[in-house]
Amino acid sequence: MDILNKLLLKDLQEIAKVMEIEIGVGQKKDELKRIISNSLEENNTELAYGTLDTAPEGFGFLKETTLGKNIYMSASQIKRFKLRRGDQVLGEVRKPIGEEKNYAIRRVLKANDNDLAALESRVPYEELIPTYPTEQFVLGIEQGNISGRILDLISPIGKGQRALIIAPPKAGKTTFISSIANALIEGQKDSEVWILLIDERPEEVTDIKENVEGATVFASTFDDDPKNHIKVTEEIIEKAKMKVEDGENVVILLDSLTRLARAYNIVMPSSGKLLSGGIDPTALYHPKNFFGAARNIKDGGSLTIIATILVDTGSKMDEVIYEEFKSTGNCDIYLDRQLAEFRIFPAIDITKSGTRKEELLLNKNQIDDIWNLRRLLNDYDNKVSATSALIKAIKTTRNNDELLAQLPKVLYK
């Protein structure tokens, strides 16, 4: 009854229809719950909810279920309803018969909170039409959000952006990711924010969970098996794609692409070829597939991925991974070790950071003012002076519109 209690009246009506239960016109929610419950009892079945995991042979299992057990799903059911790995499935479930070991789905009732007709008509993610981002995430809503305001000026991020945060060690990337996540949650109520932490320290996972309220945090820490890093990542990207297929907007902040590529390099079977640094070329395919999934869908939803990638670690492998990814994003945000050593935070290198096709995210007046700002910042002797001047200007103005209106005076106060 717990599942029935959480369902809306229209959901109960749809379930009754799929279960071939005759119901009268205008029946109330409590009556429908009782009728469905009686039908389940007569059939010796029950309702269960879980996440579909498919096998190469075509069949699958619902995992992380409300029953606490894996539930078998036949290949014919998966094919009929065009179900895929990661789908959240609600079904009528029967107990094992004879020598069977698992509970099994008798009927599929709903998936991803949609009715069955919507499932059968959905367009696969890969067939949706990608376009350049045209709707900006405004991150600098609050005066004190320096990171968000700098990004809005220097590297604006839009729905469907594929952004790389190029980060050397000790440049404050974890704090930077937290500030972006908080800004997204504060200003973008129509987008889900997910944080994916791969091969991170457990205490950093705890820190982000405590400091970012409203985001869903997924993590596989450095003491987990690399196979778990991959499992978590692949489940997350499939869930995100399904939400975008339904017209929703999802933002994934990944820390980091480098460690994800390292995990694939350990787990993937060797191709017999090695790039410089000891990385197998085939190990880069899956992380690229993950990062490349970010896109803005024409007349639909969007998947935005903001991912860190490590540089200047002293590892040749990390250098090769960066070289493979550096031309794949459409927004580059460079963090700088020198700025961090001078205790200038956020340590964003404003001379190197930028967004491709930023004119699609900003209006004509904003573009002209921001390009003027860039020219003024380039007049400084070095990036330390330029970044310090911009941060000071941000602190003395209420918002970016006010800052741009006071150029060039505000930079030389």
From Swiss-Prot:
Gene3D superfamilies recorded: Nucleic acid-binding proteins, P-loop containing nucleotide triphosphate hydrolases
Protein keywords: ATP-binding, Helicase, Hydrolase, Nucleotide-binding, RNA-binding, Transcription, Transcription regulation, Transcription termination
GO biological process: DNA-templated transcription termination
Domain of life of the organism encoding this protein: Bacteria
Matching SUPFAM superfamilies: Nucleic acid-binding proteins, P-loop containing nucleoside triphosphate hydrolases
GO MF annotations, alphabetized: ATP binding; ATP hydrolysis activity; ATP-dependent activity, acting on RNA; helicase activity; RNA binding
Domain Rho RNA-BD, residue spans: 45-115
SMART domains for this protein: AAA, CSP
The protein's Enzyme Commission number: 3.6.4.-
Class of enzymatic activity (EC top level): hydrolase
Binding site for ATP: G158, K159, G160, Q161, R162, A163, K170, A171, G172, K173, T174, T175, R201
One Pfam family per UniProt: Rho_RNA_bind
InterPro entries: AAA+_ATPase, ATPase_F1/V1/A1_a/bsu_nucl-bd, CSD, NA-bd_OB-fold, P-loop_NTPase, Rho_factor_ATP-bd, Rho_RNA-bd, Term_rho
Quaternary structure and interacting proteins, as annotated: Homohexamer. The homohexamer assembles into an open ring structure.
Known function: Facilitates transcription termination by a mechanism that involves Rho binding to the nascent RNA, activation of Rho's RNA-dependent ATPase activity, and release of the mRNA from the DNA template.
Homology family: Belongs to the Rho family.
NCBIfam families, sorted: PRK09376.1
Entry protein name: Transcription termination factor Rho
Gene from which the chain derives: rho
